[in-house]
């Protein structure tokens, strides 16, 4: 059995619920290439591994408080061994490879995780979550054209999943200059695509603040933004969030947008109403920018 002695949890922002959950539910319907009885047993074993895995994660979070994680690591190693046995017994059971690959990714074993997901993709190339994870790996390795291809395939398979649009938007933004230098995009074209992807994610999940926030922030990332549209987005976010701290953060972005529009008096007026201590530094920076461009 392959053993992974260093368990490093990688809790990513904005992840789809763990594949183990969804694919555990689908396991009974997956084509394992085995006989019906062995297929049922494989589905049962996968479901059991999924449940043990979820339980171990919850216990791990509690164990971190008491610094008593050894027993949880032992359980995780047992689950790894269980996955190894399952994929050995059912080598064409795509749900097992996906669940195992996602687990390895979650505990920080990137390379073995990628290998499992590549195998899953070879067995069945129509799982968007696999394309997304393969794209993540390529992006982390700096292989941005390959990452873009995987993200686009994920979108093609699941066009209504906001995460995939968000992932592609982030990739295009992070590697913007590289895409332009490689002549894969023109400057205006990549700016348009970045905004389109973030806008699509926000539209598909309007109740999810991170997607809406990133779309609104994207107006500051492009060369020729529509500031009127940006101002409308920030006003909507002021009304959307509930906590006073979040409202003031959105108002500070509104002030920055007003400044970019040339409305320095309106920007200063908004800033005067912001008294959240955590925003003091950002507020001072913006005020200095305003005063430098519009000295009294």
Regions picked out by a protein language model, each given a short descriptive name:
Residues 22-84, 88-89:
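N-terminal leader/linker segments that initiate helical-solenoid repeat arrays
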Residues 72-81, 106-119, 140-153, 176-200, ...:
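Structural signature of tandem alpha-helical TPR/SEL1-like repeats
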Residues 86, 119-120, 153-154, 200-201, ...:
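Canonical positions in the second alpha-helix
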Residues 89, 123, 157, 204, ...:
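Structural marker of alpha-solenoid helical repeat scaffolds
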Residues 93, 102, 127, 136, 161, 170, 177, 208, ...:
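Residue-level recognition of tetratricopeptide repeat
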Residues 96, 130, 164, 211, ...:
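TPR alpha-solenoid repeat register
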């Amino acid at each position: 059995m392959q053993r992974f002695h260093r368990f490093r949890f990688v809790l990513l922002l904005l992840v789809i619920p763990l594949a183990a959950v969804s694919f555990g539910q689908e396991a009974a319907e997956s084509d394992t290439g085995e006989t019906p009885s062995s297929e049922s047993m494989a589905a049962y074993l996968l479901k059991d591994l999924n449940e043990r895995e979820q339980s171990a994660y919850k216990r791990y979070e509690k164990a971190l408080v008491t610094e008593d994680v050894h027993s949880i690591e032992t359980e995780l190693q047992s689950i790894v061994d269980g996955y190894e046995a399952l994929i050995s017994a059912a080598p064409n059971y795509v749900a097992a490879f996906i669940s195992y690959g996602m687990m390895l990714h979650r505990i920080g074993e990137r390379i073995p995780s990628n290998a499992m997901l590549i195998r899953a993709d070879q067995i069945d190339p129509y799982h968007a979550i696999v394309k997304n994870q393969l794209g993540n790996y390529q992006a982390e390795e700096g292989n941005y054209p390959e990452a873009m291809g995987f993200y686009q395939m994920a979108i093609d398979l699941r066009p209504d999943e906001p995460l995939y649009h968000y992932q592609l938007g982030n990739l295009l933004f992070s590697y913007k200059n590289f895409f332009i230098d490689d002549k894969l995009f023109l400057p205006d074209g990549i700016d348009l695509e970045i905004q389109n992807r973030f806008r699509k994610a926000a539209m598909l999940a309007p109740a999810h603040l991170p997607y809406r926030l990133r779309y609104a922030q994207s107006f500051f990332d492009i060369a020729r933004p529509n500031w009127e549209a940006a101002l409308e987005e920030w006003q909507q976010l002021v009304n959307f969030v509930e906590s006073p701290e979040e409202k003031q953060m959105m108002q500070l972005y509104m002030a920055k947008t007003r400044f970019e529009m040339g409305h320095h008096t309106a920007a200063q007026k908004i800033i005067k109403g912001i008294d959240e201590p955590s925003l003091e530094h950002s507020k001072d920076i913006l005020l200095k920018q305003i005063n430098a461009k519009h000295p009294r």
